[in-house]
UniProtKB/Swiss-Prot annotation:
Keywords: Cytoplasm, DNA damage, DNA recombination, DNA repair, DNA-binding. One of its GO terms (molecular function) is four-way junction helicase activity. The RuvA-RuvB-RuvC complex processes Holliday junction (HJ) DNA during genetic recombination and DNA repair, while the RuvA-RuvB complex plays an important role in the rescue of blocked DNA replication forks via replication fork reversal (RFR). RuvA specifically binds to HJ cruciform DNA, conferring on it an open structure. The RuvB hexamer acts as an ATP-dependent pump, pulling dsDNA into and through the RuvAB complex. HJ branch migration allows RuvC to scan DNA until it finds its consensus sequence, where it cleaves and resolves the cruciform DNA. This is Holliday junction branch migration complex subunit RuvA. Its main location: cytoplasm. It holds the Pfam family RuvA_N. Has three domains with a flexible linker between the domains II and III and assumes an 'L' shape. Domain III is highly mobile and contacts RuvB. GO terms for biological process: DNA recombination; DNA repair. Residues 158-223 are annotated as: Domain III. It is found in: Cytoplasm.
Amino acid sequence: MIGWLKGEKIDHWNNGNRAGFVLSCNGVGYEIQLSRRNLIALNNYNVLSIWIHQVLKEDGSNLFGFIEKSERDLFRKLITVSGVGPQLAMSLLDDNSYEQLIANVQNKEVTKLTRSSGVGKRTAERLILELQNKLSDFDLNNEFSPPTKLRPESAEDLNEELLTEIKSALRNLDYSDFEILEAVNTVTSNYLDDAASANERKLLLKSLNFEKLFKQALITLNK
């Protein structure tokens, strides 16, 4: 089983809401699926080391990649839950940071968990029931090695309802979640270029409305 790879990123791939890259290691190209958060964080990196979870199938295998071993461990814990497969686990890691996901399970945040694609109320309740007391060993101070993040500030700084509305509107135009989040990241980064302080950045993010963010995200997507 493959557990870790180090090599050069040579290509990207995107198939609906699934995306990743091809990593060249000793003359072999490995196609690896990653969460959008990790893909955006690794955007400016070419030589990478990635923790791998391999899923064997009759017609081959799928490789799921993670920047940190602790996130891979969390992924493996998620797929032990009844009804939660690798793609649903990736969806949860797409829409929640490592720390947020652990906190949402431990704090019984059913509504927040159901914001992830494919996660209904019953699935969220099963996650809480089966994992609530099994995540105490996970490090809540975990930080990814790359300095870049999905958004310039914490997730709470950009209104979650606004982000949900933007995602819904752009999905209706056939953009993938990966493309949408990448565009939002670009727009917010540009919007904050002239901010002088952390407080000013937070205020600027909170001042973004649907019309402004949607228009700029659409411009970015059509470049």
